[in-house]
Amino acid sequence: MIERMALNTEGKDYVVGDLHGEYDRLMSALEALEFNTVVDRLFAVGDLIDRGPSSMQCLALMDNPWFFSVRGNHEAMAVNALKGRMWNNWQENGGRWVLKENPPDVSRVLNQAWQAMPLAYEIEVSGGRRVGIVHANPPARWSELDDMTEEVETRLLWSRRRHKTGDTTPVEGIDAVIVGHTVVGSPMMLGNVRYIDTGAYHTRRLTVEPLDQVLACL
């Protein structure tokens, strides 16, 4: 499931790393950037929830017309847990916030957000170039997303293979891809893949970058 977005001709496009409940930190970052909710757009790499203090507020960001997010593995864990699967796994990985919330409210907000989240975004930027966003690990060829198999979906949500192996082979068929999932000390490139999860929930550093800046790093 890939969603393609046309060029933003009115404002700027930004991308943010894994939020993990750090709603206030995001709002501070957007204020510093003078983010304009009328014309600007913000894309997230998934994992809006867990670990930080404000998971419900981060999920509610999906109600805003300027905010877009792909699915992350933490959203996948939460959806499965609320269906009776992987509950302990979710609780051990930051899901305990749900115990302080009204379960029907969590289920409703989470499912609404989940249904609105694609597995990948492809965004047109200046010069006819295209930037992709997935949560964890992109395929070797961007065209693989047009035939979404279970194996491809699992890699998009969970894999760290490229980072672990230091693979700098460019993803074919796309100018650049932005991912989260794997915490890095600062944003970094491997080939044409940019890693932007700087571990905001424990480092207090949340990365928000203009999409055009990502292409400048190539």
Task: List PLM regions with ranges.
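Divalent metal-coordination and catalytic microenvironments
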Residues: 18, 47, 62, 72-73, ...
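Short, well-ordered beta-strand micro-motif
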Residues: 122, 133-135, 208-212
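Conserved beta-sheet core of the metallophosphoesterase superfamily
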Residues: 155-218
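Residue-level marker for buried hydrophobic side chains located in beta-strands
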Residues: 15, 42-44, 69-70, 132, ...
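Beta-strand-turn-beta hairpins that frame and shape the catalytic cleft
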Residues: 7-14, 122-132, 190
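Active-site neighborhood of divalent metal-dependent phosphoester bond hydrolases
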Residues: 55-123, 127-130, 147, 154-165
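N-terminal active-site segment of His-dependent metallophosphoesterases
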Residues: 1-57
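Active-site environment of divalent metal-dependent phosphoester hydrolases
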Residues: 20-24, 50-53, 76-80, 139-141, ...
